[in-house]
Design a protein with these regions (language model features):
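Anion-binding alpha/beta catalytic cores of soluble intermediary-metabolism enzymes, centered on
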Residues: 40, 97, 104-175, 271
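Rossmann-like adenosine-cofactor binding region
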Residues: 203-283
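Adenosine-phosphate binding glycine-rich loop
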Residues: 266-267, 272-313
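Active-site cofactor/substrate anionic-group-binding motifs, chiefly glycine-
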Residues: 49-102
Length: 313
């Protein structure tokens, strides 16, 4: 595989990278994981300081980034906006330029992706999108790594996604066609992806000869699936008053053992977590033979480690 010099690049959306660059990062993730479990310790982030600025609560993203930085020899600082002068009205451009002098990279988890772009505009050091309302690129990288671990390839696999069409879905939509996978969204009517991301995916699917579709029947969607991917029905940032409507709309989309039996014999079940048992899937599925969700969660650490190791100068 070719080597790529990604130093100084921001990681805000996978759409900023080629298939070859993304595959390079995934291979690096797998190499770092293999070395760690073989007892080999590498420290590409030794002497580096990474800031984690999180507006949204987090279990996996915060802990995986902190563990990744530590395992690669670096040091991380976790901050909330209400602890900074941002709370009193300091503009992002001032905060960004100050943090740029103190840290070697900034990892941001927030609401609007335009805020992440604004930080990147004012910083020379790399900025990483740790989740916005629009996209969750680090999750998509962990998903791709997990699929590669389980199948050994991506091309020709059928991935079925069911759940809220929000950041995680958008990043899957943007990456699945690029890696040669067919993608089916199984969602109720009225739950549509962002037009910009769907158009990007349509172009990639047409270029690579893959299938991209939205269906409103989960059982029909999962027939012949290699990967069944469920997600919460109600994402962070969505209005509280929509919760009950969403539960009603998505009620026919619970992944059960019966649903999984319609997929291929070797099919795997994925979920980015947190999972709400009895809603998007039953306990029998997430704890059953199909589930790879905790391998998937671990791989967040390794893909984030690779991203940081590759882009930090």
């Amino acid at each position: 595989m070719a080597l790529f010099d990604l130093r100084g690049r921001d990681f805000i959306t996978t759409r900023d990278f080629t298939r070859e660059e993304l595959e390079y990062l995934i291979q690096m993730s797998m190499d770092l994981k293999k070395m760690w479990y073989s007892g080999i310790r590498v420290k590409p982030l030794e002497g580096k300081a990474i800031a984690l600025l999180f507006k949204k609560p987090s279990t996996r993203t915060r802990n995986s980034f902190q563990a990744a930085v530590y395992r690669l020899g670096g040091f991380s600082v976790y901050m909330r906006p209400d602890e900074l002068q941002l709370k009193r009205g300091e503009p992002i451009k001032d905060t960004a330029r100050v943090l740029d002098r103190y840290y070697d990279a900034l990892v941001i988890r927030t609401f609007g992706q335009d805020e992440i772009v604004e930080y990147a505009r004012w910083m020379k050091n790399p900025v990483v999108n740790a989740l916005s309302d629009e996209e969750h690129p680090c999750q998509a990288m962990a998903d791709l790594m997990t699929i590669k671990e389980k199948f050994g390839y991506w091309e020709g696999l059928k991935l079925v996604y069911t759940g809220d069409v929000w950041n995680v879905a958008h990043s899957l939509i943007a990456t699945a066609p690029v890696f040669g996978m067919d993608l089916t969204l199984a969602v109720p009517p009225g739950y549509e992806p962002l037009e910009e991301i769907w158009k990007f995916a349509e172009q990639e699917a047409a270029r690579r000869g893959t299938k991209l579709e939205i269906v409103h029947d989960l059982k029909e969607a999962v027939k012949g699936a290699d990967v069944v991917y469920a997600n919460t029905w109600w994402s962070m940032g969505k209005p509280e008053e929509t919760k009950e409507k969403r539960k009603k709309d998505f009620a026919p989309f619970t992944v059960t053992p019966e649903v999984m039996s319609l997929a291929k014999e070797h099919a795997i079940f994925m979920h980015c977590l947190p999972a709400y048992r009895g809603n998007e899937m039953t306990d029998e599925v997430i704890e059953g033979k199909w589930s790879v969700v905790f391998d998937q969660a671990e791989n967040r650490l390794w893909t984030e480690a690779a991203i940081l190791a590759a882009i930090i100068r």
